[in-house]
């Protein structure tokens, strides 16, 4: 852990009894009080996450929109100022470089939020693709700290510290230069939990002050610090993908069921478009499905999936769901077996254990309308 990178909030983890792990080269808290109580706090009240390990890249210049359009699968041409879209960057073969959020500040100024473990790879990828465009591509990850305040009471808690009317900020929109407890912030109504909430971007020197103040004013509303363990169970219940699990360089967004963020009809020949069109026209041979264990056993990532003795795929994520109180999972399997209600077997400790395919909508998301 000594060689791991540390966020500006590393100094407060011990105070809040954070248990540390190495996550993508970062020393991060996997839990504070415990994964299940933290998970339940976010579903019922609110939770505060340190997500300063995430990456931020600025795209600026005359060709900013054209470059972003070439880089991503979604369509940025229809974005309003201060709007956000979810998207993928793909390789030419349709596999995923990363999933990301695209923030539009101005017509010539975009801000991309990328996964912590992919920062160097993504930045090099963007630089390599940018040579034909009149743009600046700046990795500003070290200049930004990010906190996520998530849960049904997130707005109530954050409103105590700002004069900005947060009820006016719509889902997947941002506001710049918001003052929170005297600190200048960028806030967006986004998150990775399936709940309403905010992601707050601040100067690293202000991160500790803001973290401590939020926990102080949120205490009466049940706000708790949340580690990466509950962050993963929350995103999993909401069927949100994690890079390296539901998506990677060998799994396309279409196979993973995220076609809504892939605009094959947009005029720009974006990276991976040809391969994705061909895959759609030929028909998917693999699909991401949800499943529930029928017999005892918790499914885990990379466990093999069988149908009548034939291996048909693998588990991408599996957990005991704290909300549903059931053992459930996501798996990438042969499309011909992907019908809801089908019985499959998950290989758990060398034993095939029965499961049934169910909708991936494990949990109804509670986003602000």
Swiss-Prot record:
Pfam family, one: GCV_T_C
Name the UniProt record assigns to this protein: Aminomethyltransferase
Quaternary assembly: The glycine cleavage system is composed of four proteins: P, T, L and H.
Entry's Gene Ontology molecular function annotations: aminomethyltransferase activity; transaminase activity
EC number annotated for this UniProt entry: 2.1.2.10
Superkingdom: Bacteria
Function statement: The glycine cleavage system catalyzes the degradation of glycine.
Family (UniProt): Belongs to the GcvT family.
GO biological process, one term: glycine decarboxylation via glycine cleavage system
Keyword entries, A-Z: Aminotransferase, Transferase
Source organism of this protein record: Alkaliphilus metalliredigens (strain QYMF)
Record-linked NCBIfam families: gcvT, PRK00389.1
Keyword set includes Transferase: yes
Gene Ontology CC annotations of this record: cytosol; glycine cleavage complex
Reactions catalysed: N(6)-[(R)-S(8)-aminomethyldihydrolipoyl]-L-lysyl-[protein] + (6S)-5,6,7,8-tetrahydrofolate = N(6)-[(R)-dihydrolipoyl]-L-lysyl-[protein] + (6R)-5,10-methylene-5,6,7,8-tetrahydrofolate + NH4(+)
């Amino acid at each position: 852990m000594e060689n791991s990178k540390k966020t500006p909030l590393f100094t407060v983890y011990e105070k809040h009894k954070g248990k540390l792990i190495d996550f993508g080269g970062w020393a991060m808290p996997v839990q504070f009080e415990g994964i299940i109580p933290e998970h339940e706090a976010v579903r019922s009240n609110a939770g505060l996450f340190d997500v300063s390990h995430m990456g931020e890249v600025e795209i600026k210049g005359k060709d900013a929109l054209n470059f972003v359009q070439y880089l991503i699968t979604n369509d940025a041409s229809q974005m309003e100022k201060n709007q956000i879209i979810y998207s993928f960057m793909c390789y030419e073969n349709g596999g995923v470089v990363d999933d990301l959020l695209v923030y539009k500040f101005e017509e010539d100024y975009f801000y991309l939020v990328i996964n912590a473990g992919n920062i160097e790879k993504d930045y090099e990828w963007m630089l390599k693709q940018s040579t034909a465009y009149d743009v600046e591509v700046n990795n500003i990850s070290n200049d930004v700290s990010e906190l996520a305040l998530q849960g049904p009471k997130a707005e109530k808690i954050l409103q105590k510290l700002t004069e900005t009317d947060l009820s006016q900020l719509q889902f997947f929109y941002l506001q710049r230069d918001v003052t929170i407890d005297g600190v200048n912030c960028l806030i967006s109504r986004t998150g990775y939990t399936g709940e309403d909430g905010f992601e707050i971007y601040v100067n690293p020197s202000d991160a500790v002050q803001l973290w401590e103040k939020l926990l102080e004013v949120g205490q009466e509303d049940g706000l708790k610090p949340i580690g990466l363990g509950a962050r993963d169970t929350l995103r999993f219940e909401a069927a949100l993908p994690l890079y390296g699990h539901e998506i990677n360089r060998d799994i396309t967004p279409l196979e993973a069921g995220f076609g809504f963020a892939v605009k094959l009809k947009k005029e720009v020949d974006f990276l991976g478009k040809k391969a994705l069109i061909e895959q759609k026209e030929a028909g998917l041979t693999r699909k991401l499905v949800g499943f529930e264990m029928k017999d005892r056993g918790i499914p885990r990532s990379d466990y093999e999936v069988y149908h009548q003795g034939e291996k048909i795929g693998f588990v991408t994520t599996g957990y005991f769901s704290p909300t549903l109180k059931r053992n459930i999972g996501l798996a990438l399997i042969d499309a011909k077996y992907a019908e809801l209600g089908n019985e499959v077997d998950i290989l758990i400790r060398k034993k095939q254990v029965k499961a049934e395919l169910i909708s991936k909508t494990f949990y109804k998301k509670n986003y602000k309308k």
